[in-house]
Amino acid sequence: MNISDYKHLDNILLQVNKPARYTGGEFGSFRKYGCPLDMAISYPDLYEIGMSNTALKVLYNIFNGIEGVNCERVFAPAPDFEEKLREAGIPLYTLETGIPLKKLDIIAFTIGYELTGTNVLNIIDMGGIPLEADERGEDDPIVIAGGPGVTNPEPFGKIFDAIFIGEAEDAYEPLLEEVIVIKKRGGKRSDIIALFESKSFIWTRNKKEKVHRAIWSDFGKRVYPAARGPVPSIKAVQNNGVVEIMRGCPNGCRFCHAGIYYRPQREKDIPLILQEIDTLVHTYGYREITLLSLSSGDYSVMPRLITYLNQKYASYGVSFAFPSLKVSTFSLNLLSQLNEVRKSGLTFAVETPLPAWQADMNKTATMESIVEIIREAKKLGWRVAKFYFMIGLPVSGGGAAEEKEIVDFILRVYAQTKIQLNINVGTFVPKPHTPFQYAAQLTEEESWKKLSYIKDSLRGHPIKVSYHSPFLSYLEGLFSRGDCRAADLLIKAFKMGTRLDAWDEYSKLDVWKQVLAEADWNVKEEICRQRGTEEPLPWDNVSMGLSSSFYKNEWNKLGTNTFTSVCSPDCHHNCGICGTKTAVRNIDQNIQFPPLPPQEPIPESISRVYFIFAKKGESIFLGHLDLMGIMEKSIQRTGFFIEFSQGFNPKPRLEFAHPLSLGIVSEGEIASINIHGSCEPEDFVQKMNKCLPWGLEVKEAYVVSKETYKAKKIQSLMSLYSGSQYTLDYTGDDIEIFQTNLEKYIKENELKDYVGTQRNGNSFAFDIKAGNKKANMMAMLKEVLGTDYPLEQCRITRNRLMCSPAPGERLTYQDYFKTI
C-alpha cells in the first residue's frame, strides 16, 4: 500500500501547521520507481531543521546516484501531524513517493545532535517498526545511523541495528551495491546485517572488534555528489546554498568534537568549488551561498577566492557568507568583500574570556583584535556583533568566577565599540573522542547560577543575552558520555511522551526529570563526574583514528599555557590520523584562478513580465510566503537578469495579485517580475516550467517594457485586484442543506452585490468581488458549513482573478494585460 491509498490524508494536511513539511515535490528531489533497494534518509527533526542539514543533502545525492537505489526522505512530524496520523491509523511515510516506512529496506538516520534520540524513536514507531533492534524481524527495515552525534554508540545501541562511523562518500556505494546483490539472490535481513557487521567502520552491539572511522581521503580533489537539492519548499532554518570548501580544521581546539571527527584538514580544489557554486546559483537558484567549513578563514586563498567570487557573480545578486571565522583570520579585506551584496552576521566564538583560559583550549581570541575588527566593521555598516561563550570549561583554577570574567569582557568590548551585542552562553558538555572527554560537567544548578549572574549583570545595557537550557546540556551529557543504560532511559522517556526535546514549545523536561529520578543508578553523578585518563570509557571500542596518548597529552597541557601548533602537512603532533592513505591537504597558495568569463552585459532596459500560473497537486499546501520564495529561486534558475531593489538586502521586484488560501487549487494565479532586457513570452514560459517544483506550472506570459508601464501609469497587481471566480465541488452529505445555508449567509450578510453563485449538479460557480471582508471564500464556507476545515466537504478551484483598471471596469487580468 502506498500512502496515496489513504483517502483522508489531504484533509489531515489541511488541519495542521505547515502542511508542506509532509508533501515533498520540491525542485531537485528524486522520484525513482522499481529499484531493488528502497531506503529513506532522515535527519530526525522537523522539516525546516532537517532540510538545513548538509550531511542529509550529501547522503541523499550519494544514495540516489547509486544504480538500483531509491532513497527518499522522512523527517520528524510536529505534534499536530503526529496526533492526526495516529488517530487515523496512517503510518509515517516518505516524502518523494509516499512509501510507508515499514515497507522500506533500510532507514538511515544522520545524527548531528544527541538530543534527537526521541525523534528517532517517534519516526520508527510511527512507521510501525519496533523500537528496539532485538525486537525487529525479517519483515522490518534495517535501521542504521551515522554522524557526529553517535560516535559514542552505546546510548543508542538498543535502537539501531548498526551504526556507521565516519565519512560516507567512499564507503556507502560499494556497501549498498553488496546489499543489492544480497537482495537479488534472495538473502534475508539478517544477511544484510551480517554484511554491515563485517565492515571495519560499522558498529553493532554484538561486534567484538574495534571500529575504525571511515575517512574519505579524496575529499577536495574528486567530484562527488554535493550538498545541492532538494530545494526546500518552505523556508528552512538555513535557507541558503552550501559549498563545503574544507573538511576538518587546523586549529585543534581541545573541546571540539567536530575538529576530531573531520580530521585531518583537507582543502577543496578551486575548480570544484567554482563548479558547485555554479550549480547552486544557476541550477538551483540560490542567491546566498555559505562557504562551509569549521574555520573558513583558514582556507589557504580565502581573500583571493572571495574577491573572485564577488566579481564573477555580482550581476546575479549573489552574496557569500562564512559560518565561522577565527579572530586571527578576520581581515578588513574580508569584511569589505562580505559587504559587496549583503551583510552576513559578525560572529565571534570566544568561548572563554581570559588569555590563560583560551590557552587551555588551544585557542586565541584577544579582546584587542576583536575590538579592532568591530570598529572596522562599523565603518562598513555592521550594527550588530554576536558572541558565543561557554561556562564550565575545564580551565586553569577551575574557572573560578568565570561568569564575572565574561561580564567584564563584554562590557569592555561594548565600551570600546558601542555596537549592539548579542551574547549566547552555553554550558560546556564534554564530548567523546576529544582531549576534554575526561572533564567534569556542571550540574544544572551550577549552570543556572552562573547564567543568572551574567544575565542580571548585563541588564540595562544594549546587550541581548540568550542561553542554552542548562537541563538540555545536562541531558546532552548523558548521551554524549553515557553507556548502554542511557538507552533504557531514552526509550522510557519516549514512551512517556517526550518528543522534539530541543524545542522549547514541545519539550517535556518535567517528564525527563521524572525518568532520571526513577533510574536505578546515580545519573547525576555519571553525567557530571570527571573521568580518569586510565578509566575504561564506553566509546573505547570506536577509533576516530587518533591515538589515546594524544588525547591524554592534550589533556595534561591544561594549566601549562602550552599551545599545540596548527595541523599542517609537516606538523609533528603524532596524533595518529595522518598516514599513507590520509593526510593534511592544503591547496597551492600560488594557484592561478581560471580567467573570469566575459561578463554578459546587463541590459540597462527593464521589462516587466506578467505571468499566469497554475497551483495544483503538492503545491496547494504551500503558504503564500513560501510560494514567493519558490518563485524567486525558480526565476533565478531561468538565467534571466532579475531587477533587484536597492538597499541593505536587495530583493527581486516580484509581485503577486492576491494570496491564495491553503488547500485551494488554482488554474490562473497572477504574478509579475521585473527583468533586465526583454524576452519572448514563450521563452519565459518554457524556461520557468523547467525550473518549478511539482504542482506549479506557468501557462501564459505577457512582456511589457518599463517605458510602457511607466507611461501608462500601470498600478500594482494587488491594487488592481477586484475579486476571483471559483468552482466548488461539494462532497458533503446533503447538498440541499448546503445550498440553503449558503443563500442564507449571503442574504443575512448583505453580500448579494459581492457574491454571485450558480449551481450545476454538485458544483457551484462563484464570482466573488473584492470590497467586503465577509465576501471571502474560506471565511464564508467556515460559517456555512460550521467547521474550521471546510475543505473536508468540498474541493475548490480558483479559475480566474479579476481586476479593475478603471472605475466600473472589471475584467480578467489576462484580458487587461492584452490591452497594455
PLM regions: where:
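Radical SAM enzyme core and accessory elements
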Residues: 2-28, 39-41, 460-600
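N-terminal [4Fe-4S]-dependent radical SAM core
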Residues: 10-40, 47-48, 198-242, 544-558
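N-terminal pre-triad scaffold of radical SAM enzymes
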Residues: 41-45, 63, 230-255, 281, ...
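Conserved SAM/AdoMet-binding glycine-rich loop
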Residues: 41-46, 279-425
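Glycine-rich beta-alpha loop elements in corrinoid/cobalamin-binding modules
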Residues: 77-210, 435-483, 490-506
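Flexible glycine/acidic-rich beta-alpha junction loops that bind and position SAM and/or redox cofactors
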Residues: 79-80, 155, 300, 330-334, ...
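Canonical Radical SAM [4Fe-4S] cluster-binding loop centered on the CxxxCxxC motif
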Residues: 235-271, 574-587
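Core RNA-modification/binding signature centered on pseudouridine synthases
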Residues: 605-606, 621, 627, 732, ...
